[in-house]
Regions:
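Short glycine-enriched nucleophile-adjacent loop
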Residues: 2-13
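Mobile gating loops/cap/lid regions near enzyme active sites that modulate substrate access
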Residues: 180-298
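Flexible loop/turn segments at secondary-structure boundaries
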Residues: 1-3, 27-30, 127-129, 204-207, ...
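Short Gly/aromatic-enriched secondary-structure transition segments
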Residues: 132-147, 266, 270-272
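Amphipathic alpha-helical segments in well-structured domains
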Residues: 1, 36-40, 216
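Alpha/beta-hydrolase fold catalytic core
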Residues: 122, 149-191, 196-201
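Substrate-access "cap/lid" subdomains that shape
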Residues: 14, 19, 23-142, 169-174, ...
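A short, mixed-charge helix-start or loop-turn motif at secondary-structure junctions
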Residues: 23-25, 167, 233-238
């Protein structure tokens, strides 16, 4: 999803596609030049090198070790470099150059890919893929502080009064990284070709249900290949959700062929969102208080 949204912001990609599906990821996921410089300097320091020329001679093993070390360094919040805070990925694409002049959201606001029809959305519990255990209150508050979203946490606590710290962390990180960027992309395209929004809510039964509607779970549904090796482990025990896969796959194919997935386009008035689950339906402006909590933050 991040890659598709980035391509939509690249002038050199203009005219190469008529439809785009930034799936589980949209805007907000590039680095500015100054952040990229910090990442590059740290990466080279890990290798004990000083230039790109020297890097070309480094072994693949050494590069991978340095990459992991650099990722860990920025994941700890040390040398924080962009608006993702403690969840930063240091190896995002870099904007502010000829290939990617602006970040994807600014590009969309300026009319980039305005003739391209877009289908975008996210899964309800994206970040359980990286966090299925217990979460301390301290970790929750530290993460939210990194997002500068303490007020948003208060809103989620009101809308989810029975939620544990772990549940709140999953909800907030999912929205910060996936749902809100997709919404911002759709909002930025109000005068462009239609944008359609979905949310995948079907819960995996694997690991006693701990994954819920996690990141990438929607992929075998969209491609209608639930029978592929390994997918059953991701789905968990129980009857096959083939009916949902048929429905979702048809929507994706219809959108690819015609630009229409089968539900109303997203706008700032109705915010129509297709919920994919055992029972699927269009919901207008889901979780409005939580969405509004990110205004001015994300």
């Amino acid at each position: 999803g991040f890659s598709v949204a980035t391509l939509m912001a690249c002038p050199s990609a203009e005219g190469l596609f008529q439809q785009a599906i930034p799936q589980s990821g949209a805007c907000h996921h590039t680095l500015p030049q100054e952040a990229s410089k910090k990442v590059t300097e740290h990466f080279l320091d890990e290798l004990g090198l000083n230039s790109a020329v020297e890097l070309e001679a480094a072994s693949a093993d050494d590069i991978l070790i340095a990459q992991r070390a650099t990722s860990a360094y920025f994941a700890q919040g040390a040398g924080q470099v962009n608006s993702l805070g403690v969840a930063v990925s240091p190896f995002y694409p870099v904007h502010g150059n000829a290939t990617l002049p602006n970040d994807p959201l600014t590009a969309a606001c300026n009319g980039a890919s305005s003739t391209v029809r877009v289908l975008t959305g996210s899964n309800k519990d994206e970040t359980t893929l990286w966090s299925t255990g217990e979460t301390s209150r301290e970790k929750l508050e530290r993460t939210v502080a990194g997002y500068q979203a303490i007020e948003a946490l208060a809103v989620y606590q009101c809308t989810r009064p029975e939620a544990s710290s772990h549940d709140l962390l999953v909800a907030l990180t999912t929205d910060h990284m996936f749902r809100i960027p997709a919404i911002r992309l759709a909002e930025a395209r109000q005068e462009a070709a239609p944008t359609f929004m979905y949310q995948f809510n079907w819960r995996s039964r694997a690991l006693n249900g701990a994954l819920a509607a996690t990141h990438s779970l929607e992929i075998p549904f969209a491609f209608n290949n639930l029978d592929q090796a390994g997918v059953d482990f991701f789905l968990g025990p129980g009857p096959s959700p083939q009916g949902l896969a048929d429905t979702m796959h048809k929507a994706w194919c219809d959108f690819i062929k015609t630009g229409e997935p089968g539900w109303p386009a997203y706008d700032s008035d109705t915010r129509a969102t297709m919920f994919f689950d055992d029972i699927y339906a269009v919901v207008e402006d889901p979780d409005p208080e939580e969405r509004a909590a990110w205004n001015g933050i994300r």
